[in-house]
């Protein structure tokens, strides 16, 4: 942003790790703030939050929606969204495809493709609530599907790989159609707007899940659009991200060699595909994947006393150098049966964790945790590169 830019108000950009915003107390009522939305680059913006029950206890979306309200200034209305796990128990064996369509023609064309490759057990519009703050919405639809066994046999693919390829094909080759969620017994809900409004728009108070993640977006290098809002998902993996990764091009070039297509104009998309590649394709554990994307410095590895751990970390850094994510970031990674929270190795973005009874809370700010659970205990900030992994009790989800 040029230093000469003037917006007609006395504006001072305060940059620090916790929040960035414009001071416009006196003139706010007289100024149309919509005219500058999206024009200001706030690299430490964005808000993330998550809650999970370790025993699989269901909760509505109200709590996670409320958690975003005290972090309102971290967003600018150009993207908000949620991921919820355990919300489709009656269709838990089917892939829930959440989709945006520009028009009926694009939906019809996409359905033709789906019918040729999947058994569609249910097709319906995703219920929404009309509110003034969410406008210009596309057609928002969902399908519960299972890959046709004859197609799997002819392609010699397992169903997860087949679904992932189908998602890539739709998102890159079918004009006006976009799959923004594709997992089993989970769903992503996102839009252009503030997250607390997006939650109301999608009626998330009527859904029940054992795990929720949320994101309020402040785009740094890309436009705000429905597909670009977080979370980003592939199969049951979802990512909400606060930060700006400087390794995007190197990461993207590497991951696209394995069939992934980065088309959504954001660095967060590549993190989702990296996690899918490391966990589903390479069969790494969550801790190992964390040690790849937020790898310790070589000097830190050399100082390790445990030789087994030292050799393992050296191996991961040597084999996957192009998947090291550099630059400031904090992420919450969702999957069926758990969550993982992770900071960059220098901890250049805030992230706080708290607990109460069977629940674990994660957020950019402690205030968000206190909204979800005023009596939260064991509040702490994980160290840079320290993975916080929470799993639901086996058989409880």
Feature-to-residue mapping (PLM):
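Short, often N-terminal, low-complexity regions
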Residues: 5-22
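Conserved short alpha-helical segments that host acidic/polar catalytic motifs at enzyme active sites
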Residues: 24, 32-397
